[in-house]
A protein has these predicted regions:
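Generic hydrophobic segment detector
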Residues: 1-19, 69-81, 130-131, 140
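Non-catalytic accessory regions of SAM-dependent methyltransferases
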Residues: 1-44, 48-51
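Short, functional N-terminal and low-complexity linear motifs
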Residues: 24-31, 67-73, 119-120
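Short N-terminal secondary-structure initiator segments
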Residues: 25-29, 80, 139
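Conserved AdoMet
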Residues: 33-108
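Conserved SAM/SAH cofactor-binding pocket of Class I
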Residues: 98-140
Length: 140
């Protein structure tokens, strides 16, 4: 007797998201966006769209890495900090959200024409955020 394996159709975006209770909706949407090259808005609007097998395999690999402790920012290759997108990898410290307070406090205290030296602070996100927000301040 020849028994053929019954194939299961890949899930829709929404079905995949609902099957991942350990991930937040944001985490799911960001991973879906990565494998589909779609914005989060497009993911939400097209929630009934079906994943193809390549996308599903890539999502499964990303989920395994995430569950083993790889930061989401490393999987995505970027992290937003103070409204700016920074490329990140395991070779770069991921800018932390609470560090945005340091930028806010610095911006309040720095006057135009002053110079700031950023030395050995990790990714440089603090310096870039200050320079972006206060263009008349010299940041090195």
């Amino acid at each position: 007797m020849n028994i053929e394996a019954q194939s299961v159709a890949p899930p829709s975006f929404d079905q995949w998201r609902r099957s991942k209770p350990a991930l937040t909706r944001l985490e799911c949407d960001l991973l879906l966006g990565l494998v589909t090259n779609m914005s989060r808005t497009q993911i939400v609007i097209n929630s009934d769209r079906t994943l193809d097998l390549t996308q599903l395999k890539r999502l499964e690999a990303l989920e395994r890495a995430f569950n083993k402790g790889t930061p989401l920012a490393y999987l995505l290759g970027e992290k937003e900090f103070f409204g700016l997108a920074f490329d990140v990898s395991p070779a770069v410290l991921v800018p932390r959200p609470e560090t945005e307070l340091l930028v806010e406090l610095s911006i309040e205290k720095i006057d135009a024409g002053q110079s700031i030296l950023d030395a050995g602070t990790g990714s440089g996100a603090v310096a870039v955020a200050i320079a972006h927000t206060r263009p008349k301040v010299e940041v090195t």
